[in-house]
Amino acid sequence: MNKLHSFAHWKSALTLVLLVAGLPASAQTAQPSGSREGVPTLSGYMEVHLNKEQDLPAEADLHRFVLMVGHSFTDRIKFWSEVEVEHAFVEGAEESGEVAIEQAYVDLMLHRRFNLRAGMVLIPVGIVNERHEPPTFHGVERTFVDSVIVPTTWRDIGFGAIGDLGRGFSYRAYVVPGLDATGFTADEGIKDGRQQGGHADASDPAVTGRLEFRRGGLTTGGSFWYGGSGFGLTRLDIEPPTVGVSSLDARYRRGRHELRGQWSMVNIGSAGDLNRALQLQSGNSPNIASRLLGAYGEVATRVSPDSWQHEVVAFGRYELFDTQNKMPEGFLPLEEFQRSALVVGATYFPDPDVAFKFDVVRERNKSSVVNAPWRVNLGVGWWF
């Protein structure tokens, strides 16, 4: 990709972000938030899991330990960061642990409706990718939809705008580097195509955004990601595939009851050409789909008496997550990746910021050969 073409991509992406954000009609002062000026803020969360999968030994894991640091240089210039350690320690490979910067950005507060953000940002798609502290969701593990369809945790270097539009509406919109299509797979879709902000190739940018509405106990949101994924294919004679991600979600809480749902879809352009090109490169076709689709619905109810100071919440969730939903011409779906799951369990809150969790997961797929496993999970998580 030549420099002129790359510049044109970035110019178009920045223009779209500004159009999504909109400019304020007046020049009111943005309201300060975060730590007091000159005083750093420390926060964090942790989650420990005990997982037992069918026919496998039980596994105990300090899955995540995260520290967050914020600082207000002035009432208009604010910094926020998040450093994560996965699986307790690092020993040369991600399977043995990982240290990662999940967020590290600066906000320039200009106006309630329009403020600038730059740095390492979380892609604002779905519910869990931006808000995944353990007490904020039921179940020991994150949802399948937010792991397989929306590749949580999804982060990258970004520049864009955030704001509160009033009447319950807010938004976030960024320009970010694109994906690496050579990492796409049949079972986890675009997950291994994330660049994660480390020496990210920015020649084929993407735009991403979210519009959110809050009113009382209801929160709804619509989000998207759209951009290129072809920089890793420069040696192959194919048109760089574009990727579009769209997602709708809703959360509602009233009294003892909670409802939550999400629908997410990924479209991969030129998936057939991509499969053929990668097969020539590696000798095996990755069988990448042209469309991935996922959705879930969750119901939760507080079952502890009102006289208790602590809360016990029972929940049930049904998920569909199909990474072979639509195949390019000439390719057949792998039925073991057309999946569903039923998750039932309970969460005990001795404090609103501490959660002890239990669930049972029954996963299914359409294959008559590959059996999906069942799992029993225990976990504890907190944040402060």
How should each PLM-predicted stretch be described?
Residues 1-7, 14-56, 384:
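N-terminal periplasmic/intermembrane-space "pro-region" immediately following the signal or transit peptide
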Residues 30-181, 203-220, 291-304, 313-326:
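Outer membrane beta-barrel
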Residues 52-54, 93, 104-109, 137, ...:
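Outer-membrane beta-barrel pore domains
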Residues 7, 88, 365-367:
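Short strand->helix junction
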Residues 145-148, 195-198, 237:
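Short, P/G- and charge-enriched loop/turn segments at secondary-structure junctions
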Residues 135-143, 189-192, 276-280:
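Short glycine/proline- and charge-enriched loop/turn segments
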Residues 188-233:
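Loop-centered beta-sheet repeat module
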